[in-house]
Curated annotation (Swiss-Prot):
Quaternary structure (record): Homodimer and heterodimers.
Organism ancestry: Eukaryota, Viridiplantae, Streptophyta, Embryophyta, Tracheophyta
Species for this entry: Oryza sativa subsp. japonica
Transmembrane regions: 61-81, 100-120, 139-159, 175-195
Protein family per UniProt: Belongs to the Casparian strip membrane proteins (CASP) family.
Protein name as it appears in the record: CASP-like protein 4B2
Amino acid sequence: MAMVPADADAAAKPPPDVEKPDYSSQNGAPNSAAAAAGGGGGGVVDSVVARWRREDMLDKSPLALHAAAAAFAFVALVLVASNQHGDWMEFDRYQEYRYLLAIAALAFAYSLAQALRHALRMRRGVDPVPTASGRLLDFASDQVVAYLLMSALSAATPITNRMRSAVINRFTDTTAAAISMAFLAFVSLALSAIVSGYKLSKQTYM
């Protein structure tokens, strides 16, 4: 009886599986470390872009807010000055409305000057007022004019409410509209003061 050699039996058996090396990184497929690095880079870029947008908005907001305040104050000024309809319906008969007229004129002149200043700064890239002094000026003067507007509103609103409780006519309607416009001017300057305060807090002196 023929004997099968042991070497022949070993040759007949299939070879064991050999673990194949991973060539995915060499073939261009990103590994986990590269993917993580890519994701981190995208987050950094997004944060930088978001910061640029925020700084751009903060840079343009003083012009927009002061222009809005000037427009609202001008409308309030015109409404009060033209509110003359004879007899008791004359704005200059009431010191509250005279005060409102004076403060509206002041707010219009101040806001217009500030809007022109910021427009010049954005157009030429140079602020007529030095940066440190300009931010302090914006923060302080915005608050002062906003406070004066609020004091004028506090004086004019009660007498207007008393008049409207007795009679509603062109005079009282015009006065109420002027008060509304002055209030919007106050809101614009208050927001501008907040922006100026934020810029002032971020200012470096080194």
